[in-house]
Amino acid sequence: MTFSGFDLPDELSALRDLVGRFVREQLRPTEDALGPEAIAIPPEALAGLRQRARSLGLWCLDAPAEYGGAGLTAFELVVVLEEACKHRFCFPHAGAGSFGQSPPVVLYQGGADIIERFVRPTIDLGWTSFTAIAEESGGSDPARAIRTTAKRDGDHYVLSGRKMWITNAERADYGVVYARTDAGISAFIVETSRPGLSTSRIPVIRNHAPTELVLDDVRIPAANLVGQEGQGLALAANWLVRGRLTYAARAIGIAAEAVRLAVQWMGTRSTFGAPLATRQGLQWSIADAAVEINAGRWLTWQAAWKADTGQDARLEAAMAKLYCTELGFRVVDDVMQILGAMGMAREIPLEGWFRDLRVARVVEGTSEMLRSQIARQVLGPAAKARN
């Protein structure tokens, strides 16, 4: 048996290069023109970027091709996301939204009606969405923490409760809300135009603020239930695997770009008569970053490959998200130190990445929760408490 090696397929390499050129030639110049105080790309500029991205086939990257998306597998997506995140406003969405927002992956379990009412408009019309799991009572343990309720009332459900730390809710067209029913946790599609739904921003350290979502007896059609009652946590597990993989890939892309900035700086700056690139302490920082980035990349690729082959990738996705977000934050911190005062300046994206990656270590599974999850998987029954 001949080992075929680790080279990416030519088509995937070409796609990665295409995304990289779009970021360098289209996206970064748009961001640079906004000035250091900007926190997002204005809607009119974003519309132009979206049109150009769509003409290149870079639209709703992981949405199935049969519905009009790019149809990327999990592996293809994480490879591409590395390049798609090498710019200033790469959170909460790679490309600052230039590539559209794919429908929540759970919707594909909802049947033909949900496909027509929500999936196709998301891709065709550029609708945006949110996913609401976390609540004030907790986010890492949804089976116990979710207190939002959904009561059946004839052909409708009535949802009541509060969700916290929700991305996109203030400007989305709809969202997937997880609520407690008689059969357990269930997933519902809630349009933001429904009476009784309101949002408010929660200021945090990064530029993009999450929101609090209040559901005050919000009535939705029973047809907006995704799957069956009680299937919500199973549906959320698939969403979390994909979400954790994308966080890992984005952290790797940012870390790699931060190292590129450091290498460029070290090659042109001198202290006490010698280039920074000759300083052993700084050399070791770059060496450690290069090793960690490569390790994180392979960890993420393995997890994505496992997900694509239909295997349970929850453990590997947790490992990838934990390792890559931690290393991404550490690498950006080190590069800021290498650049000194310039590392803090808003003229370059390091300080924004620093804040974004600090948040990334908390959302979609805190680093501590992921370590506990990994430990339980590795230790097996020995990890369970005994009386």
Task: Please describe what each predicted stretch is.
Residues 72-73, 141-144, 168-172:
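Short glycine/proline-enriched turns and hinge-like loops at secondary-structure junctions
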Residues 139, 164-170, 359-366:
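Glycine-rich phosphate/pyrophosphate-binding beta-alpha loops
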Residues 145, 193-221:
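Flexible, small-/acidic-enriched active-site or ligand-binding loops
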Residues 147, 155-156, 160-198:
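A short core secondary-structure module
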